[in-house]
Design a protein with these regions (language model features):
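An acidic/histidine-cluster motif and surrounding catalytic segment
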Residues: 1-108, 112-230
Length: 230
């Protein structure tokens, strides 16, 4: 399996986090190397959006009710909007790569770190996308998310329902997930249909069929300062 880590070139925090990530993968003896994927940076957001004919369609303040999806779009705390868009574009480009090579890939953000060796083949599951990250410290309502997963006997299960039906409910952050070509094509279709949202909002159970998580967690977040919120 190919694995890619999104790294902001020249950003000391991101570069150091990537080293921690790769070291952790070696320590758990994963059977793959992690390729560095240069993140889109705020300076290149406009050109990248234009090149791929993408429009941003998510509020910066307050909330909006999306009539097309029935979902409520709540603004994220974002001091630099283009940093938020750049993050989403980095994931978008990896979705395109997955669709192009037509095989599953592991997508990692620089702040992920491995705690367990990946010991399963995603092709043994019918899920399109599988999150492998421990939710504790990584997502809102993290304890509810964790408890719901632990209460389910399935080793790979659908993303848990932990909130109102109109709140996008996805993975425990997007710091670590395996995506199949079917999942990548679905994400690209959603961007074309609804515009680009924050990647962890668009990748939600309400819009993506077969969006799953593992009961055994293979990664956790390093607990670093956000490079998108600040």
């Amino acid at each position: 399996m190919k694995a890619y880590a999104i790294v902001i070139k020249g950003n000391k925090l991101s570069e150091a986090a990537f080293e921690t990530l790769t070291d952790s993968s070696k320590n758990v003896e994963n059977d793959f190397l992690i390729d560095r994927f240069e993140a889109v940076t705020p300076d290149y957001v406009d050109d990248t959006m234009k090149e791929h004919s993408i429009r941003w369609n998510y509020p910066w303040v307050g909330k909006e009710q999306c009539l097309e999806t029935g979902l409520r779009k709540n603004a994220y705390r974002t001091d630099n909007p283009k940093a938020r868009i750049a993050c989403a574009l980095s994931h978008y480009l990896l979705w395109k790569r997955c669709a192009k090579i037509n095989e599953p890939i592991l997508v990692l953000e620089h702040d992920a770190m491995f705690t367990q060796k990946i010991d399963f083949d995603v092709n043994d599951s019918n899920m399109f996308i599988v999150g492998i990250n421990n939710p504790l410290g990584a997502t809102r309502l993290a304890r509810d998310y964790y408890t719901t997963i632990m209460g389910n006997k399935q080793w790979i299960q659908l993303v848990p329902k932990i909130d109102h039906y109109d709140i996008p409910q996805g993975l425990a952050g997007n710091s670590a997930y395996i995506i199949k070509p079917a999942g990548a094509n679905k994400m690209l279709e959603l961007v074309k249909q609804h515009g680009l949202w924050p990647n962890d909002a668009l990748m939600c159970r309400q819009l993506v069929p077969r969006l799953g998580v593992t009961k055994k967690f293979y990664t956790k977040v390093q607990g670093l300062r956000s490079t998108t919120s600040l």
